[in-house]
Swiss-Prot record:
SUPFAM superfamilies: Metallo-hydrolase/oxidoreductase. Coiled coil: none annotated. This is RNase J-like protein. Its EC number is 3.1.-.-. PANTHER family: CLEAVAGE AND POLYADENYLATION SPECIFICITY FACTOR, CLEAVAGE AND POLYADENYLATION SPECIFICITY FACTOR FAMILY MEMBER.
Length: 421
């Protein structure tokens, strides 16, 4: 019998970790850290044959250096991006040591999409494209004859940087699926609409002589935003002003350029036509950022919780300047305070009065509710489904949707749940 043990990522976003246990072997699907609290799953690394990583975001891979795993499987881009995620975590929190990162990197084995790997005599797996960030994968396992699809984070729609998630997948017994936007209330505007809103907000500020600060996540969101802005500048629909970048997004964007064959083919075509899709990456020079000329500043971190973006927030003293939030802002973060209309913030010693405009235009690398519904209709019908990686309301809502749509048993585990399959 195969057991699924849920160590995290249940009725929450963060700390994703599922253990697949058999009598002859066991593997972990992701081993993430909570972005809010730094909490990690409690697992026995000595008993685990391997960790299979879906992608390089902190909530899916951040806990790996805490442990001494024998083997870590991921795609080639994910290995490079995980190094950036781990080094960022080390710099910000001192959660682990450089030697821990080195140990993890030395035990990574990289695979391409669709390439099969046997881990133990009764466990083999392969990766499908998940469409979430560069190198992101859904994990397809065959364990004691059972076929399990762990989606990781998926986006069934096309983005500027990536092709959509694969849906032409082998037969499935058990589906383990994310539910970030699992509620019928989680229907997002079309990507073109969001892009127009972003450019209109930037244009308004630039034309008034102001500066635009855009906090981003280093991997995925940063590249999408840079691609959009540079595309509109090239087309003449946005004034050509300096774009300054700061933080680990500079290294992450270099990784994106290194793996151009893993991206949307349109990006490869741009490069072959001598166009830099992400624009010239200029490290922010504070003497230029804080002068009187209009500019755009794209910097980590996405939730304004640490990172170099904090030093640019004093620009919001000036009503001409603007902050554009492009993603989810967790409870307790400075980003959430700003989103909720804080009139004053204190990222450092001195308080900063907020006179500039703060707007939110959410660009998500996750599929919205409609996208998730399309996904479950396109893939082979599983015998049962398990819903995780979503807040309680979203997970329970999407479990109900799966039941109504596919008429199959659907589970919403909590941390510590053990399910026999």
């Amino acid at each position: 019998m195969v057991l699924l043990k849920f160590h995290g990522g249940c009725q929450q976003i963060g700390m994703s970790c599922v253990e697949v246990e058999t009598q002859k072997g066991r593997v972990l699907l992701d081993c993430g850290m909570s972005p809010d609290t730094g909490e990690i799953p409690k697992v026995d690394d000595k008993a685990v044959d391997a960790v299979i990583v879906s992608h390089a975001h902190l909530d899916h891979c951040g806990a790996i250096p805490f442990y001494k795993f024998k083997k870590i499987y991921c795609t080639h881009p994910t290995a490079d991006l995980m190094f950036i995620t781990w080094r960022d975590t080390l710099n910000l929190t001192k959660a682990y040591k450089e030697e821990d990162i080195q140990h993890a990197m030395e035990n990574i084995e990289c695979l391409n999409y669709y390439e099969e790997r046997q881990i133990t005599e009764n466990i083999k797996f392969k990766f499908y494209n998940a469409g979430h960030i560069l190198g992101s994968a859904s994990i397809y396992l065959e364990v004691d004859g059972k076929k399990i699809l762990y989606t990781g984070d998926i986006n069934e729609g096309v983005s500027r940087t990536l092709l959509p998630a694969d849906t032409d997948i082998d037969e499935i017994d058990v589906l383990i699926i994310e539910s970030t936007y699992g509620s019928p209330l989680d229907i997002k505007p079309a990507r073109k609409t969001l892009e127009r809103q972003l450019i209109e907000e930037i244009s308004e500020t630039i034309e008034n002589g102001g500066k635009v600060i855009i906090p981003v996540f280093a991997i995925g969101r940063a590249q999408e935003i840079l691609l959009i802005i540079n595309n509109y500048i090239r087309s003449g629909k946005l004034r050509d002003v300096p774009i300054y970048t700061d933080g680990s997004l500079i290294h992450a964007t270099a990784v994106y350029m290194s793996y151009i064959n893993w991206l949307n083919p349109k990006i490869k075509n741009m490069v072959e036509n001598r166009i830099n899709p992400f624009g010239e990456i200029k490290k922010a020079d504070e003497s230029l950022v804080f002068n009187k000329e209009p500019c755009i500043i794209v910097s980590t971190s996405g939730m304004v919780q640490g990172g170099p973006v904090l030093k640019y927030l004093k620009l919001l003293k000036d009503p001409k300047n603007k902050l554009i939030l492009t993603g989810y802002q967790a409870e307790g973060t400075l980003g959430r305070e700003l989103e909720e209309g804080a009139k004053e913030i204190q990222p450092f010693k001195n308080k900063i009065p907020i006179r500039g405009k703060v707007v939110k235009i959410e660009f998500s690398a996750h599929g919205d509710y409609n996208s998730l519904v399309r996904y479950i209709k396109k893939i082979p019908k599983p015998e049962k489904a398990i819903v995780m990686h979503g807040e309680r309301y979203q997970s329970l809502s999407f479990a109900m949707t799966i039941w109504k749509t596919l008429k199959i048993p659907t589970f919403v585990p909590v941390r510590g749940t053990i399910l026999p399959i």
